[in-house]
Amino acid sequence: MNPAIPAAVACAIGLAQGQAAGATLEVHTTASGTPSRLALTSTEQFVAGRQPSEGDISVFVNPAKAFQPLLGIGGAITDASAEVFAKLAPKDQERLLHAYYDAKDGIGYSLLRTTIHSSDFSSASYTYVAEGDAKLDSFSVAHDREFRIPLLKRAIAAAGGHITTYASPWSAPAFMKTNASMLQGGSLKPEFADAWARYYTRFIRAYEQEGIPIWGITIQNEPMAKQRWESMIFSAEDERDFLKNHLGPVMAKAGLGDRKIIVWDHNRDLMTQRAHVIFDDPDASRYAWGMGFHWYETWAGGAPMFANVDAVHRAWPDKHLLLTEATVEGFDPARMQSFANAERYGTALINDFNNGAEGWTDWNILLDEKGGPNHVGNFCFAPVHADSNTGELTFTPSFYYLGHFSKFIRPGAHRVDASASRSSLQTTAFSNPDGSLATVVMNATDKPVDYRFFVGKSEARVSIPAHAIQTLVVR
């Protein structure tokens, strides 16, 4: 094997050249109206492929055409998640950790986001310094030692001792801002730019002293949103200048230049403009690992703007793209088992990966039976909810849809060419470091679909129920 070719891609090339013929295909399924949840529902044999007709519905995978690597797939541990987790019985805590982070028997989360001090998904606003302490002499993460840090450490342990972890701030402390509040937007006062930059470095050092390695940071959560919770506005030019004149140099001087800095961290709608302003400035771009984005641009109506992910990927191919937050808002217990919520996840994961994303991070991993706690009442869905009165855990369809990606597509995998012949099916495929090929196929229609599954020159026959998702694995 050419040592320059990743093992996963080399194995995939073998599949593309016809070596799948005679191999076994595992079909794992989650389907509405059935008990199937990440269930191995069938095994199929590959045979030599034949030319499909126009009337056939087919999925085509060409493993010889490889694209971006996978950083990971996971979710966020917020104060809310940690507070709900702490109320669970020990056996239920272990069940949740096992379900999320065990790569063999759970869904193998490999990416984790957390917050720099409070967000709306905290029981109250707080910071790590005393009011007015621009020198950061009072800096302490003692608040997080009660709930969040213990859960983070247990998640890392459950994941086998390593999980790629990054952190995001929702707002600078009130005294550093133009509106003198952590809430309702406002912007960073110029005279506190260096102090705020040093705040990130103090956070990283403090968390690492607690045993939580920080891989990277985003500069600002949702920098164009004035929210009734913790929020702070950065125009594109403001974020560019803060990065190149303050945060980047301060991180480098602190010996943290190897930590990744992620810009934007907001919706797909404005990401091309933000990329142009920051990535086309060489003094800023040198500090930026890439761009984070969210999925909430549909708040104004219209469809998800996946094409903007592709536009940034094509224009700045040296920059990395990462979905940093997604959640279904407007919690309603009657929709807890909604497959529409799950299909929103499936559609976004497939399209974000197909347009160049290297990782995908859901929002809260766990919330209570009201979609909280949230100190401003912004209650949302999570893949798992816990009843704070009974301790009962509810695993939603969204958990299993996320698992169809995270369980079978592992860090270091490379996306490979995949397409469907009809719009009734959506698909993406990855070749894993262990040589396995994982293809996700989703049917969001009201009818089951029989389809031909082609891998290179070989094919197998597969059926997918209505409102279902499958992961097809060739080992």
Language model regions located:
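Substrate-binding and catalytic surfaces of secreted/luminal carbohydrate-active proteins
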Residues: A23-L40, F46, Q51-V61, T165-A167, ...
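Short, well-ordered, mixed-charge alpha-helical segments that flank or form enzyme active sites
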Residues: P173-K177, A225-Q227, L270
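N-terminal catalytic cores of secreted or lumenal carbohydrate-active enzymes
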Residues: P35-I214, S235, D241, N245
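A short, flexible beta-alpha/helix-coil linker loop
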Residues: D79-E83, M224-K226, V328-G330
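A short small-residue
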Residues: A180-Q184, P223-R228
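Short, solvent-exposed turn/loop segments enriched in Gly/Ser/Thr/Pro and often Arg
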Residues: R113-D120, S168-A172, T218-E222, D265-R268, ...
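Hydrophobic h-region of N-terminal signal peptides that target proteins for export
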Residues: A8-Q19
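Bacterial N-terminal signal peptides that target proteins for export
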Residues: M1-A7
